[in-house]
Amino acid sequence: MPVGRKEQIVDCRAVMGLGEGGGLAQRGTFAEGLRNDVVVVAMSPGRRHITKPVCEITYGIREAGIQTSVLVLDAGGGIPSDAPQGSLGSTFGLKPDEARQVNRHKLCVIHFGNVKSHIIYKARLFLKYVTIPTIIVCQSPVDMEDFAKIGIKTLDVMPLEPKTEGTIVEIITGVVRGESSPQKKIDEIIESIKKHLG
């Protein structure tokens, strides 16, 4: 008999984990929850892209009793090729399989980094193919208008010419990449999820 805990079954790891004990998920990993309620999406791990806050966010959401899947993008680093400054290094992208995996859920939480222009252009490419309501989690202070200016549909501000299928329903800023996420930020994410899951 479990005392004070709810069991969650997670079908985990498409590929072997990285680091000591395999604790870090590699790019292309999809860990599916028992029910398709929420999916948390992380950028690809690398020197600059650390998946650490995503692990803590996911743990907090699951601890709140919400069924949660996790996807680590295969090409999550860099910026999209259609961004104004272009992509000098790696190029951000979304595979058709990844879009299908995300779209099976009711709500998406995606963690971006701390460069404003990278965040908004990555979000536009992501939401071009992801059709479910999405919560953006990032470090940089951004608002709905920043996204709407480049054609991203948002709950508060609709662009004149929408370029996305999906809609941003909430933005949570101040979550630093590679650092432990403060409990108040995790609580804020959980409250947003509960609000938009209905």
Curated annotation (Swiss-Prot):
**Source superkingdom:** Archaea
Keyword set includes Protease = no
Sorted keywords for this record are: Methanogenesis
Task: Provide an example Pfam family for this protein.
Answer: MCR_C
Which InterPro entries does this entry report, sorted A to Z?
Me_CoM_Rdtase_prot-C, Me_CoM_Rdtase_prot-C-like
Which GO BP terms apply? methanogenesis
Transmembrane segment boundaries = none
Entry keyword Secreted:
no
Subunit: MCR is composed of three subunits: alpha, beta, and gamma. The function of proteins C and D is not known.
Which protein is depicted? Methyl-coenzyme M reductase operon protein C
